[in-house]
Structure formats: structure tokens, C-alpha cells
């Protein structure tokens, strides 16, 4: 077998050269990549590899799992079973032979050392036991000698002690005799004194009885206390006093004091005497020195000497009652503290964090401020974003007045036919497209030009780098052109002006420059900063120059973005697709958006299930300045919301729910504020007519635009009220809502489903479909105009001059007049003018010509006029006859 190089052997074995060199090194052979390998070395390597393959596993892991059930008692006598699973894991590691020999040697040495230590310990214990026995023997000998000496001393003292005892006994007997004699004398004296007291008491009692019999008056003698029963009577008095005290306490607590106090009196005499006997027995047992402890039913509660300082956690807003509960005080105390600080509040009033902090610190508590958006900040900060920024494509928004050729211009650039697909030839959605040019990529946003789409244009200006302002050369600056300029200036975005329709004969580019200069858009040739490009979307003139101008402006801006890391962007448009669910058009600003990423988007969250570009093709990722449609959100996000990729779906859901709750709180607070501010305006609310509308559209941007346009139509007499709005088709719920609120169902580029149509037919609802916003607004205007009350207008139909005044018994003063203008008609309202000043306004009661009643008198004829309830008519006055006509008003 011939020698081969190591590289050839590596290629033959299909392993890397470095791996093969390492295997040779493990087998004990040093080789480099260019060395040759002999047959013997191959055999050595093969044997080494076989040994490695045959060797068993170095590590063995055993797992054991046990399950048990634990019963936990719960409330209401019910118990709950909890499943407990215990997992144990043990790993055995196989050692190599050399390691095993080394460990065995160490264990043997350790055993020998332990044996040696044990023998030494036994010898030490023997020595200590021998020494202890010797010490005990010596101590025993000492004790025996001491006891012997003690016995000898006791025998010597025994004789002398006996003599002393005899003398003590004699003295004690003499003392006892004297004490007995003294006790006998004392007893006799006490008996004599008691006898004298009894005789005196009997004498006094007989004297009192004799005097009572003499006066024939019976009296109850005062009881004489027996000194022998002193303790018994004392205990009885004490118990009576305690019973009286207890009755007062119990009577004060209960509703009926008399009933409570009378309750112990109902007890029998046996129970009372038993208690008295027990008290007396206890008192007698105590003797003179014994004291019975006083008992009382009153429970004493003392107020804490010092206030308890607590840690009070305060959120961004808190009510006065909640703050009082956290501090464990009454709400009135918190209100008093706020009044001292100069703030008036009720117990249910919501106060801000700063005010609550001042009040809590004033009352001596420690305050812990809690930010409610702490979780949101933590989620947003826990993101991977790359550090290196790279150049990115510019995002260009095309703005301008309606029908000035914005979409057609973009259409020519993209070589597609978008304008023909839009209803009415006007753009009603934001179209996001990116196109490749020879000099780089450009992302275009096409915004609507109609006045109703103000929010869409503002959103486009916020998400863009450069604004291309399209102005028709034959039309000049129009209202939406001015609005687009204002949006661009507010966003601080440079403007490139595209003067379109330059191929028309009536085109006047200089007029466009002059008009734009009035709004601060000056061309470069006039010393300004804006580039002006003459284009024709129809003929394709100047398109390349426009793209070059855009790329030049982008180069000046030095647009950069981070490509690596988690993506972030903005929602350009969103809608609800019946088959795919919520769909959002997202413009990525930085990072890379991948399929499967977890995104947080305003009030919604979800995982990106699919991504499509503007051509409807599936893509797996999208970098900066790339618009894509994403699927998988929990709901339809609002256009303009920030899109952020996060790590944890659970936390994203919590943040989305927090945002929804916060939005609801702000909305309710705003409604409450408006109710308070418009209190007087709402007093006449019943006189205002309302047009209720349930609006459904295909995309979120259209819902916003139509809602804003309709709400702006409201007047003091007729108001438009959007009862409900949303994205998607008209459902049965929408129809039911419209029936309940007497509303008009409006569908913009959507249709009603079968169940909704049944409800609409049964309830006879007004359902209208639209595809052009002009028609929708015009019809709502017409409906509102029908609700307006007509305008009353006074029209002068005749004027007569008073030439003479006659008296009539029936009508009073009659004015003889000459009709100078128009026609005088009977029963019409009139005004009497004197020196061109109205002095009376009333009704024409009588109109005669030659004593005949007539209905009207024409110009140039004489007549007699009687004014109802007015007699102060003079010569030279003018009588003006007018009529009131109704004029139907319309919404402008």
C-alpha cells in the first residue's frame, strides 16, 4: 500500500484536515497537513479509532419520577386534591483506568491513616482510664480518713451535749407554765367584757321596747351587726356593689338599659345565696391578711401612644378613599390634611401622584411611588438592537391636491395601473411600494389628496424622509396643496416639487413657483432649498430627473438605519380580511422583521404568521424602509401605531392589555370632563336633531377619514353621531345596533352578510353602500339638511303713505292712504313708520276702497286702512305691509 498525503486521506474519509490532524495527535502521531501517511500509521490510527468506538459511555444518567396526591382542606368543608410530582436525577461518571488506580491508592492510604489514628486513640483512652482510677483510689483513702476523725470527735462531744439538754428542758417547762396562767387570766377578762356588753345590749333593747309600748308606736330596730360574722357581711356588701356596677355597664351597652339592669333580679334566691356563700367562704379562708382580687367586666382599650408609620404604595392616580385605606386612617382625616395644604377634595375624587405623596408625607408615612408603565418600559428595554448603522433607502411620500396626478406619476414609475383600480380615480388608501432604480432603491408612500384624508396625509408625513409635492401646472396651488406644505413643515421634512401636467398647452410653471413662494417653498434658482422638477406623468417627461433629485436629497440627508437586531416600525394602514384576519401594512424603520417574530403594536400583539410585499409575494424578512403586510395580530391596530418586536409573548399581551385599560380610563376621564364643561350646553340638548350612523369600511384609514369628515358636518341644530365604526363587512351585530339606535348603516367598500341582510329587511333599516367618499358626504349633508328647521324671512310687498285720518265708530282711526309701492293685502302684518322709524308693528284689520271691503289695493290707488288695536295714526306716516316666507336651509 503506497503512502498518501494527509489532505488526500482527509478527502477520502470526508473529514476536515484539522480534524484528521487532531485524531493523529490523539493516537500519538504528530502530523501536518502536507505530510504523507504510511500504511503502518494508518493501522495505528484505525486501532485508536476502534478503541474509541468500542469504549462504553462515559456518563450514565438515571431519572426517577414519583407521583402522589395531597388533599388540602378548603373553605365550606370542601377539600382540594393537588397532584405532586417528585423528580430525582442521578448521574454516574465512568473514570479511566489510571484515574481509578489513583483513586484506589488514595482510598487505601486514607484507610491506613484512619486505622493508625484509631489505634492511637485506643491507647490514649487506656492511659486516661488508668490515671483516673489512680486518682479515685487516692480520693477514697482521703475520705475514709476524714470520716474516721469525724466519728471520734462526735463521741467526745456526746457527753457534754446531754447535760445541756437537761437544762434546756427545765427552762422550757417553766416558761409553758407561765404562759398558761397568762392565757387563763386573759380568757376570764374577755368573758367578763362580753357578758357586760350583752347585758348592756339587753338593757337598751328592753328600754326601747318599753318606750315603744308607752307611745303606741311600732318601729323596726336597727340590726346590730354580729362581730363574729364581720367577713361575711363585708363580702356581701362588696358583691352588691359589683353587681350594681355590672348592671350599669351592661345597661349602657344594650338598647334597653332597664331591661338589662333588671335581668339579674329575676334570678332565684337560691342562686344569689349560693354566690354569697362562695364569696364569704373565700373571704373567711383568706383570713385577715388575705385580699380578694377585684373583678370587673369592663374591657379597657387604650389609644396607641404614637402613630404607626406605614409604607404607602401610590400609583399614578388614586382616590382619596383608597389613600385613606392604605394609611389606615379615616377619609375625613385625609380631607382635613388636604384642606390644610389648600386643596379641596371629596372622598371619591381622583388625585394625582404628587398630591397623594404630599398628603401621605404630611401625615408621617413613607411613600413608595409606583410607575404603572414599568412593565412596558422593561419590555421595550429588553431588546436586541445592532450597534452599526448602515445607509438605507429613502422613504418618499407623494402629496398634493386631488386629481393633480400623484398616483399617475407613481404609476408611471412603477409601470403598474393603480389609478384605474381606485374608485372614482382618486386614491383612498395609503399605498406603500418600493422600486429599484439604477441609482438605488426608493420607497414610495402615496397619500390621498381629498380633504377627508387629512389624518392619512399627516401620518404619511410623520413616517417619511422626503415629501414630493405634486402640483398641476395648469391648476396651481390648491387647498390640499397648502395643507400638504403645512404637514411637511410640521414634520421638518424637505420638499421636492414636481410640477406635473407640463405637456398641457395651458401649463404655467412660473405661476406655480410664484404661488408656492408665498408659502415658503422657494426654488433653488431663486435662492431657496427646494428642487423643482417639470414632469408629465402621462408622457413620462422628467421622471428620471425627479428620481435623481430624490436620491440627491437622500444623499444630503445621510439616511442610516440599523439592519441587525429586533425590528421596529410604524403601521401605515390596517384592515380586517375575512379569510386572513387582521392585516397591517408596516413600514420597517430599523432592524429586520422576520416571520415568526413576536410584535407589540399599540393595543394589539401577536406573532407574525406571514409577510407579503406590495406585489402579494410571500417574504421571510424585511429590512429598513421596506413596506410589508403582516398577519397574525390579535386585532386591527390603529394606523400610525408603533410596531416593536419583543421577546416574550406573555409580557407583550400584558402590555397590550395595560394600554387598553389606560386608553379606556383616559377616554372616560375625557367624557366626564366634557360633561362638566358642557353642562349648560347640554341643557338644550333635547332640541338638537341627531343623525345616527353605523359606519363600516375596508381599511382603518378610511374609517378615520370618514368619521372626521362626518363629525365636522355637525351644526348647532343637527349633529352627526357615529354610533359604531369598524373594519370589515357589515355583520348581524352592526344591524342590531343600528336598529336599536335608529341609525343609518353605511358601508364603504364593504357589503352586508346574509344574517345582517335578514335583520335589515325585517327591521326596514336604511342601508347605503359607497365607494367614493364624495357621494357619502353629499348624501349625509342632504339628510341633515332635511332635519334643519326652515329659515323665516320677511318680504315687503307694499308701502302706503297716510294722506288723511278719519274716525270710524267700528274701527277707530282710519288712515286714508295712497299706495306708493307694491300691493297692500288684507290680514297681512304691517309696520307703522314715522320719520323712517318703526313705532308700531301689528296686523292690517280693515282695507276699503270707496266704502267697499277689498282684499288688495295696487300701486297708485287710494284706500282706507284700519290698523288693529292702534289709533295713533297721523298724517305723513308710512304703512309698510310685509309677508313671512319660509326658506329651506342646507348644510354648507
Curated annotation (Swiss-Prot):
InterPro entries assigned to the protein according to its UniProt record, in alphabetical order: DNA-bd_dom_put_sf, EF-G-like_DII, EFTu-like_2, IF2_assoc_dom_bac, IF2_II, IF2_N, P-loop_NTPase, Small_GTP-bd
GO molecular function, one term: GTP binding
Region (G5): 536-538
Chain spans, region G2: 425-429
GO annotation, cellular component aspect: cytosol
Source organism superkingdom: Bacteria
Keyword field contains Nucleotide-binding: yes
Protein localization: Cytoplasm
Boundaries of every tr-type G domain copy: 391-560
Region (G3): 446-449
Bias (Basic residues) ranges: 254-269
Recorded family membership: Belongs to the TRAFAC class translation factor GTPase superfamily. Classic translation factor GTPase family. IF-2 subfamily.
NCBIfam families: IF-2, small_GTP
Name of the protein: Translation initiation factor IF-2
Species annotation: Salmonella schwarzengrund (strain CVM19633)
Gene name linked to the record: infB
